[in-house]
């Protein structure tokens, strides 16, 4: 109940780019149904500041997400800072043993999800069909 009161009378701004305007509208519509007011802000590029951002992030095949989450990186768009996450990302980049590296990145993923620096809406799947 206290969380609901903290949003009472406030309008949240959802920033996005044109390609994701429909996704942002869907989020705004869902929030409206539960009484959360929001407005869309469609920009041409990644904004410097935002309340809520719906933006595509391409994750690498390798689990190293140093450029996305390490506090020293300009590409850390959420400005997230967590010393434990920083250390795991640093260790993962330098570890050569694949089993140890796997454990490091599993810990990174677990702590990142527990800390909630971002809400991951979905991971789209794209298919390409071609003739040989």
Report residues per predicted region:
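N-terminal hydrophobic or amphipathic helices and topogenic motifs
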Residues: 1-8, 131-132
């Amino acid at each position: 109940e206290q969380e609901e009161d903290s949003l009472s009378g406030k309008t949240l701004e959802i920033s996005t780019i044109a390609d994701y305007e429909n996704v942002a509208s869907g989020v705004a519509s869902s929030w409206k149904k539960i009484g959360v007011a929001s407005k869309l802000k469609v920009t041409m590029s990644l904004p410097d500041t935002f309340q809520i951002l719906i933006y595509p992030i391409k994750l690498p095949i390798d689990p190293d997400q140093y450029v996305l989450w390490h506090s020293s990186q300009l590409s850390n768009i959420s400005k997230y800072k967590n010393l434990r996450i920083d250390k795991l990302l640093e260790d993962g980049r330098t570890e050569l043993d694949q089993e140890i590296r796997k454990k490091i990145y599993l810990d990174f993923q677990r702590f990142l999800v527990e800390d909630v620096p971002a809400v991951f809406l979905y991971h789209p799947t794209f298919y390409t069909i071609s003739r040989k």
